């Protein structure tokens, strides 16, 4: 089957960018896929992997992103401002690229821009806020669940780390509640994504993932 094609008018020549995935009326192009792989590798400090397996995994993640974007638009969810991720970007640069010239050199080596990095960090923050707003109100963590997690996970680890000391639930309660709430949110998110995929016409062009 022939792949759908898009002409990139911004290119100096007629460069053809193939559609890799269609999600409803949205598309993910091969250049979108390529850029996502590069930016993710840059943030993780590894070399980009353009194997079919990585392209497939990246495409699946980008499908989820499109589904969330559609839900946010339809539900009029708030989007965090770009300024909200600048502290995280600053921390990243200070940790890995304290020299501004080194940061720019690394961007060039990965074939990406500072804007690409900012967009990725903004999306990560947007996703976290979406999950929190969309699913946290329905999450309930019971006292028994907190006690069970403490007995099975926290107490053994704390005892091993501090022999001779008896860990107290009160010292870990808030942390345990946050952990369990986060797990419940993730579970609800996975369920929602499965339902959203069933409701949405998704077409993957396997040829573009080779």
Language model features by range: what are they?
Residues 1-10:
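Sec-dependent N-terminal signal peptides
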Residues 9-14, 26:
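Boundary of Sec targeting at the N-terminus
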Residues 15-22, 52-210:
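Peptidyl-prolyl cis-trans isomerase
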Residues 17-48:
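N-terminal targeting signals for Sec/Tat export/insertion, comprising classic cleavable signal peptides
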